[in-house]
């Protein structure tokens, strides 16, 4: 199976501008993400996709592969699709978030394994090691799944809501945190970019809700590997503890 790893990276993040270029103990965040992805021997090619010259120059500086993309892309998925269109021989594309400096190659290979099943369109990761603070934090995305581990819904809110339950909600239900790494069959990735945005996607600010709304299945792969991401400046200190 030929697998393309793409790291979409933009400078103008609303919550943390310039995030890909922050220094994490001597290396930029984008370099740490790239190097983590390159550790997998099952990914044929790893490429950073950006529309910013500063990020482009940084990737070239540390010797990584990078492609400049259109500025008009509304999401990282669209940016990935543009790059993937140049690699028609790739069967699976992994969207490796540029804010995951601790990405573990074993997580990526768990996603690849999901495509052994011919019916898998999209796969993503989740883990069950949430704290109550995580459950209440809108920057920690929660997901609920069905009996076959396909996603039913993603939310920034605590789902399911436990207002009728007594005691600690975490003792009553195995809350799952979504880890924002995605893999797609190449043909499906190109289809996703043609879908119309939906009200659910807009109100939650979660593009994967568009795919669910339009009938695509998202397979959740449970991982026990802990990889804190950097969504806002306050997350940096937590990541530095792991380096």
Model-assigned labels for residue ranges:
Residues 47, 53-96, 100-113:
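Short phosphate-binding loop-to-helix
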